[in-house]
């Protein structure tokens, strides 16, 4: 009982602080939610009956892989992607064109060959557009704090499931309208989210040299391949798209981060997908309630969980090293090829003529071996901390700033925008709000005393104050 009382006290405590984390969530919620709902309706769990010579989801995935590789290779020349509307326009145009092609393939009175060609074209355009959307989304999301990244991502994926639920009962005409409207809404909301960012927090066009955290990508590759081995056999309601299994994982993660952000142990979450996926594959041959359904949900939930954790690690590394997350997000998107490879391996085993029980045993053994190798080789938390500066694996590591710091930074950003301060003046205002004196500010920014005095004078003039004490009062700071 005392433990339960403490738990309830933690939930009641700091309601205003928790609400602060969700300020401005709506454009993010609808951006990723609409995009994921569109993918589900278009290819993951198609709402239209389409005739094609092969799996359209594979075409979609391969197109997404190709565009992700292109973005990763050209990241230095492309960033910041959201600075202009060009990349957003290409993404929206590709997804809308994909919808129109898929609708025509399913509804237009065309020869069978033409319908198949349109379906393949639609899937390819969809993969291209969605691949671009994911890197655009990652770039915008990287500008906010880690706790918000976690909350916004989980809430958005949960919203995607809700959108699919309401679209699934529509007739053909309304589904077609939804398939056209959803990608447009996603891009418009993404633009709104980007424009709401303070200028000082927006992505920099300068990309310093960096190396890729290949062990993290290798971890995701192993899980992607393992998931692909069973993707075709997953029970209804399971899958990496906007499914019930996704909703379960995202709801639990969101609630945990929202109510217990200071206690959330990302390190424990980091290890939990191994247990889920191994149990899922070992349950494949089982009968009854512990058979295909439970196995499918465990496998799907493990893959959804590892995807969130890997993304969070990449955001953390990008923030700490000061590099663009676009290249990391593009490589993550390209790893969808391992899902396709896993499906291909499963189909090859099926074509070999082996009994189903032997196939299940071989696949389960392969997955267990892969997961053991991953645990022995890839789970190097000390390396993540020492080489990449990762701290989120510690208990409470998800919270970078206290609620008071969040409020102070929001006030500084608001005042800087209202007073039209330059980026350098905004930096100085941030440090003043933190209570730092002149020598500390000069030391941190490597500027001369005269330069600091000139900038400070401009800040006072633009903000309509006469001295530091009045500026502190304007900022709501306790320190003069």
Where are these regions (language model features)?
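Intracellular juxtamembrane helix-capping segments at the cytosolic ends
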Residues: 130-144, 306-321
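Glycine-rich segments within core transmembrane alpha-helices of 12-TM secondary carriers
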Residues: 145-168, 328-346
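Helix-loop boundary and gating motifs at the non-cytosolic
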Residues: 8-68, 219, 223-238
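Intracellular loop-helix junctions on the cytosolic face of multi-pass helical membrane proteins
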Residues: 2-12, 147-148, 161-237, 251-264
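C-terminal ends and interior cores of transmembrane alpha-helices
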Residues: 93-112, 274-288
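Linker/hinge segments immediately adjacent to helix-turn-helix/homeobox DNA-binding domains
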Residues: 36-41, 67, 194, 214-294, ...
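Hydrophobic core of transmembrane alpha-helices in multi-pass small-molecule transporters
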Residues: 115-134, 291-307
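Helix-turn-helix DNA-binding segment
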Residues: 397-457, 461-462, 472-480
